Amino acid sequence: MISLDQVKQQIQAALPDAEVMVNDLGGGDHLEAVVVSSAFTGQSRVKQHQMVYGALKDALASEAIHALALKTFTPEAWAVARQTA
């Protein structure tokens, strides 16, 4: 099993400016992550997700993370999403 802090640290190691929020959806291996980074600017949603999955590849391969619900935002898109939430 991997801690929520470890997930956050691994994402931030790959995306140093990232704001990362991680929640356990059950069992410790089903997680939800919201990642906000300027590195996502100009990238497709698929590419954004690949960037995060790449940061967590070892945890995913070892099944320390079994399922990951992922939401990615640029800082600008996050500002809009927070206003409409």
Swiss-Prot record:
Lineage summary: Bacteria, Bacillati, Cyanobacteriota, Cyanophyceae, Synechococcales
A Pfam family annotated for this UniProt entry: BolA
SUPFAM superfamilies: BolA-like (SSF82657)
InterPro entries, alphabetized: BolA (IPR002634), BolA-like_sf (IPR036065), BolA/IbaG_stress_morph_reg (IPR050961)
Top-level taxon: Bacteria
Similarity field: Belongs to the BolA/IbaG family.
Protein name: Uncharacterized protein ssr3122
Annotated organism of origin: Synechocystis sp. (strain ATCC 27184 / PCC 6803 / Kazusa)
